[in-house]
């Protein structure tokens, strides 16, 4: 195993531990707690892939961080932090909507890069809206936390989520995944709208009412794509 891969995992484990302590003291806001929960799943997946124990890695990560802090001057961290552009966290969904369990009568699933696309193909003739929580930087989507498809009644019928074991995706990856999800839902005569936040940062090819403009040929292609993988 590459030493940089191991040390990166160890530091990530320790920093997650620090953030968990902050959350335990009720000092974290909703985006902070949301990222904490997502990163926990990611670390578990990475730990399984690398064959490393998280508790042991956390202790090793603490030693690495302490050594770096001893070497740093007081001014260096301030300069580094000031030079890094800040990302913004945008939320369409509440914590309840993000954490709610949902079930599919006719489950369909596709893995596209580091994103997992899931939908219930038993849903027909419904009005559906796509909502997402994600971060943006330089007015572009930086990291998708979770995207879900809701009916007017509030039922969850589709989802796009990052795979914990495969971190990293681009805004183009997210846009392509949204296209696949929309194509699959519209194949069953559902009407799909995209939230204003998603329209602005992740899905720009839409009509004025927020409905995505996909030609019939592309809809059929996307539907066949997701039907071919369960």
Curated annotation (Swiss-Prot):
State the post-translational modifications. Answer: Upon interferon induction, ISGylated via host HERC5; this results in the impairment of NS1 interaction with RNA targets due to its inability to form homodimers and to interact with host EIF2AK2/PKR.
Motif Nuclear export signal boundaries: 137-146
Q: What is its main location?
A: host cell
Biological processes, Gene Ontology terms: symbiont-mediated suppression of host cytoplasmic pattern recognition receptor signaling pathway via inhibition of RIG-I activity; symbiont-mediated suppression of host gene expression; symbiont-mediated suppression of host mRNA processing; symbiont-mediated suppression of host PKR/eIFalpha signaling; symbiont-mediated suppression of host type I interferon-mediated signaling pathway
Q: Has keyword Ubl conjugation? A: yes
Stretches for region PABPN1-binding: 223-230
Location of this chain's protein in the cell: Host nucleus; Host cytoplasm
Q: Residues annotated as region Disordered?
A: 206-230
Q: Which Pfam families match?
A: Flu_NS1
Query: Which stretches of sequence are listed as region CPSF4-binding?
Result: 180-215
Gene Ontology molecular function: any one: protein serine/threonine kinase inhibitor activity
Q: Which InterPro entries match?
A: NS1 (IPR004208), NS1A (IPR000256), NS1A_effect_dom-like_sf (IPR038064), uS15_NS1_RNA-bd_sf (IPR009068)
Q: What is known of its domains?
A: The dsRNA-binding region is required for suppression of RNA silencing.
This chain belongs to which protein, by name?
Non-structural protein 1
Identify the species of origin.
Answer: Influenza A virus (strain A/Herring gull/DE/677/1988 H2N8)
